[in-house]
UniProtKB/Swiss-Prot annotation:
It comes from Crocosphaera subtropica (strain ATCC 51142 / BH68). Substrate binds at Y15, G42, K109, Y132, N187, N292, R388. Transmembrane segments: none annotated. Its cofactor is pyridoxal 5'-phosphate. The keyword Acetylation does not apply. GO terms for molecular function: L,L-diaminopimelate aminotransferase activity; pyridoxal phosphate binding. The keyword Transferase applies. Involved in the synthesis of meso-diaminopimelate (m-DAP or DL-DAP), required for both lysine and peptidoglycan biosynthesis. Catalyzes the direct conversion of tetrahydrodipicolinate to LL-diaminopimelate. InterPro entries: Aminotransferase_I/II_large (IPR004839), DapL/ALD1 (IPR019942), PyrdxlP-dep_Trfase (IPR015424), PyrdxlP-dep_Trfase_major (IPR015421), PyrdxlP-dep_Trfase_small (IPR015422). It catalyses: (2S,6S)-2,6-diaminopimelate + 2-oxoglutarate = (S)-2,3,4,5-tetrahydrodipicolinate + L-glutamate + H2O + H(+). This is LL-diaminopimelate aminotransferase. Homodimer. Pathway: Amino-acid biosynthesis; L-lysine biosynthesis via DAP pathway; LL-2,6-diaminopimelate from (S)-tetrahydrodipicolinate (aminotransferase route): step 1/1.
C-alpha cells in the first residue's frame, strides 16, 4: 500500500486562514443578511495599476501573433524583467545585486516554502513568535520538526518571542541557529527594522555560518527614509542572506501572481562532506527542475511596475492603503485599544480588550460587528491576546468597520 508523508499529520487542525473562512461561512449561513467586512487575510481590493493592465493587454496581443508569440520562457524569469528589478529595487539603493541573482516566481509564499528543498534536514531553525504561519508549517511538512508541546510550539524549532516589551523585534539568540526567518515590515505585527538592527543579525549570521531568510514582501510600505528596504543594504548580507519579494501588495498582484527571490552567487552552505556549495546553483537547479516560469503576460505586467507611470500608480496604491492603516489606528486608539503597527506597514496589531483570548475576540467581533480580523494566536503562542487587522480594503469598508467597532467596544 502507498504511504503518506507522516509529517503532514503533525500539522495543527487547520491552516489559519482556512479556519477563519470556515467560521465566517458558518456565520453567513446562519445570518445571510449580515454585511461582512473582511479585514483579515491580507488580500488587496483595488484594481491593478493601469500601466500593468495596459502592458498585459499588449502581451496578450503578442501571444496572438506568430512573430511575437512566446512559449516556454526562462525558468528564472525573462532578462528584461530581472534587469529592471536589479537596477531599480537594488542597485538604486546601493545594493550590489546582479540580474542573474534574481529568480522570478509566482509568489513569495511559494518561495519561502520551496527554499527548504535546497537545505538539509538537520539545520536548527529560528522563527519569531508570533510569525507568518507558512514559515512554520512548511518546516513541519519538510520533516524539520517534532510534535507540538502544550503551548502549540513545535519541537525542534527555536522560537524568538516578540512583544511590546521588545518593540516586536526579536532579541539576537545566544545559541547557535542555522536558518533564521526575518520579515520586515513585519507580518503580523507591523514592526519595522532599523539598519543597526539588521546589521546585528548579519553579524550574528556571519559569526555562526547561518543563513537569513529575509521576507521583504511589504517593503513598498516603508515611508521612513532611515529604514532599509532590503537586507542587502547591510554590509556583509550577500554572504549570509536570501531575500524574498512580491508584487502582490504594492502592485495588487495577489490574483495575478508574480514575485522574486534573490540568491547571491557568493552565498554558500555546507555539504555533508564539509565542502562549501553555492546556493545559487542549487536554487537554479531546483527551479529548472520543478518550475516552468511565470507566464510571459504576467511578467510584462510586472515589468510595467518599473515604468514612470507604473511607479506613480503604485505610489498611489501604497498611499491609499497606508491612509487606511492610519484611519484604523486612530479610530481604535480613540476607542481605547492598545494598538501597534500601521506605520510603514499595512497591518495593525492590537491587544484584545478585557483579557479576551484571540479567538474569543474574533468570534465576538464577528457576531457583534460583522467585521473579520485575524486572531493573533494563529501566528503563534506569543500572539495569544493579540489581533491583526489588515488595511487592505476599500476606504468605505474601512470607515464603516471602524464605526462599528468603536460603537461596539469601549476599552
Amino acid at each position: 500500500m502507498a504511504t503518506i508523508n507522516d509529517n503532514y499529520l503533525k500539522l495543527k487542525a487547520g491552516y489559519l486562514f482556512p479556519e477563519i473562512a470556515r467560521r465566517v461561512n458558518t456565520f453567513i449561513e446562519a445570518n445571510p443578511e449580515a454585511k461582512i467586512i473582511k479585514l483579515g487575510i491580507g488580500d488587496v481590493t483595488e484594481p491593478l495599476p493601469e500601466a500593468c493592465r495596459t502592458a498585459m493587454i499588449k502581451a496578450v496581443e503578442d501571444m496572438g501573433d506568430r512573430s511575437s508569440f512566446k512559449g516556454y520562457g526562462p525558468e528564472q524569469g525573462y532578462g528584461w524583467l530581472r534587469e529592471k528589478i536589479a537596477a531599480q529595487d537594488f542597485q538604486a539603493r546601493g545594493c550590489d545585486i546582479d540580474a542573474s541573482e534574481i529568480f522570478v516566481s509566482d509568489g513569495a509564499k511559494c518561495d519561502t516554502g520551496n527554499i527548504l528543498d535546497i537545505f538539509g534536514k538537520n539545520n536548527k531553525i529560528a522563527v519569531t513568535d508570533p510569525v507568518y504561519p507558512v514559515y512554520v508549517d512548511t518546516n513541519v511538512m519538510a520533516g524539520h520538526t517534532g510534535e507540538t508541546n502544550e503551548k502549540g510550539e513545535y519541537e525542534g524549532l527555536v522560537y524568538l518571542p516578540i512583544s511590546a516589551d521588545n518593540h516586536f523585534v526579536a532579541d539576537i539568540p545566544s545559541e547557535k541557529v542555522d536558518l533564521i526567518y526575518l520579515c520586515f515590515p513585519n507580518n503580523p505585527t507591523g514592526a519595522t527594522a532599523t539598519k543597526e538592527y539588521l546589521k546585528a543579525w548579519v553579524d550574528y549570521a556571519t559569526a555562526n555560518d547561518s543563513i537569513i531568510f529575509f521576507d521583504a514582501a511589504y517593503e513598498a510600505f516603508i515611508t521612513d527614509e532611515s529604514l532599509p528596504h532590503s537586507i542587502y543594504e547591510i554590509e556583509g548580507a550577500k554572504d549570509c542572506a536570501i531575500e524574498f519579494r512580491s508584487f502582490s501588495k504594492n502592485a495588487g498582484f495577489t490574483g495575478t501572481r508574480c514575485a522574486f527571490t534573490v540568491v547571491p552567487k557568493q552565498l554558500t552552505a555546507k555539504a555533508s562532506d564539509g565542502s562549501q556549495v553555492e546556493l545559487w546553483k542549487l536554487w537554479n537547479r531546483r527551479q529548472s527542475t520543478k518550475f516552468n516560469g511565470v507566464s510571459y503576460i504576467v511578467q510584462r505586467g510586472a515589468e510595467a511596475v518599473y515604468s514612470e507611470a507604473g511607479k506613480a500608480q503604485i505610489k498611489g496604491l501604497v498611499s491609499f492603503y497606508l491612509e487606511n492603516a492610519k484611519i484604523i489606528c486612530e479610530q481604535l486608539k480613540s476607542a481605547g485599544f492598545e494598538v501597534y503597527g500601521g506605520v510603514n506597514a499595512p497591518y495593525i496589531w492590537l491587544k484584545t480588550p478585557h483579557n479576551l483570548s484571540s479567538w474569543d475576540f474574533f468570534d465576538k467581533l464577528l457576531q457583534t460587528t460583522h467585521v473579520v480580523g485575524t486572531p493573533g494566536s494563529g501566528f503563534g503562542a506569543a500572539g495569544e491576546g493579540y489581533f491583526r487587522i489588515s488595511a487592505f480594503n476599500s476606504r468605505e469598508n474601512v470607515e464603516e468597520a471602524m464605526k462599528r467597532i468603536t460603537q461596539a467596544f469601549k476599552v
